[in-house]
């Protein structure tokens, strides 16, 4: 069962994609996995705050594929430390670059991944060219142009 909450998409459109439109509170309270996809603006900054995170079941996981500041990171750290939710998968942080002492970096119930914003043919062409260039530089013992910092 896929639940969705979006103020800009009607129930029929969501149903045509295999989902069921519900309120944000219902979505948070009923979901095993909450995947976040939203733009960052003044209305969405800290959208997932302590109050909303508290609605999530203890066995649930939060997956943020939006922007870091849509989640109140201090509140997220608290719910993860207290095991109020099972875990989180993040590829963005509220403050970037992320501080070396950020607790999210060392938590066993957090999965971290590099962030990739772009999803267009042009972007993939660029990624392929840049990736091959980095591999070639590495093979020659040179430092690649793009290095993901740990």
Region locations from a protein language model:
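Conserved SAM-binding motif I beta-strand of class I
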Residues: 4
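C-terminal helix-to-coil terminal segments
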Residues: 94-150
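Rossmann-like adenosine-cofactor binding region
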Residues: 7-103
């Amino acid at each position: 069962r896929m639940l969705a909450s979006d103020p800009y998409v009607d129930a029929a459109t969501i149903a045509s994609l295999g989902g069921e439109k519900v309120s944000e509170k219902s979505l948070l309270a009923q979901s095993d996995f909450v995947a976040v996809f939203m733009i960052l603006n003044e209305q969405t900054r800290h959208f997932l705050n302590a109050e909303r995170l508290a609605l999530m079941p203890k066995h649930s996981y939060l997956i943020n594929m939006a922007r870091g500041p849509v989640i109140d990171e201090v509140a997220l750290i608290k719910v993860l430390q207290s095991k109020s939710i099972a875990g989180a998968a993040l590829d963005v942080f509220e403050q970037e670059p992320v501080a070396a002492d950020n607790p999210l970096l060392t938590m066993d119930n957090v999965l971290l991944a590099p962030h990739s914003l772009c999803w267009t043919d042009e972007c993939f062409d660029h990624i392929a060219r840049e990736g091959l260039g980095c591999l070639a530089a590495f093979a020659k013992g040179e430092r690649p142009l793009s290095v993901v910092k740990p």
